[in-house]
From Swiss-Prot:
TM spans (from-to): 10-32, 50-70, 85-105, 116-136
Subcellular localization: Cell membrane
Protein name: UPF0756 membrane protein NGO_1674
Topology within the bilayer: Multi-pass membrane protein
Amino acid sequence: MNFSFVPLFLVTLILLGVVSNNNSITVSATILLLMQQTALVQFVPLVEKHGLNLGIILLTIGVLSPLVSGKAQVPPVAEFLNFKMISAVFIGIFVAWLAGCGVPLMGRQPVLVTGLLIGTVIGVAFMGGIPVGPLIAADILSFVAGKV
């Protein structure tokens, strides 16, 4: 008899996602569990190959949409010359660089994603954190641990 812990792990993530009010983990784990347990399993390699890039595209659309809706304005050039705006630009550059370290780490050592997910869920459930997900956690892990 061949037993896989993956469905149990996904159910655990679903429960932790519900308890911690982390919809992204709840929905993601539910979709993956349904895919794994049905004929949709044939599409898992496609999700594995393109899911992260599609997710980043959707995230970028979500971040830029306030500009399109008019809820946010592009500031005049003069406003880029204050300390907060300059700091925001440099922090954005730094975080983008970190992401360049974290995404490859997730591809090279996908087992670490499990730990990052568990840590994210615990941080949200018990420490009042925000579910930014494993991507920024992988970025920081890569930075702290020297590209693991």
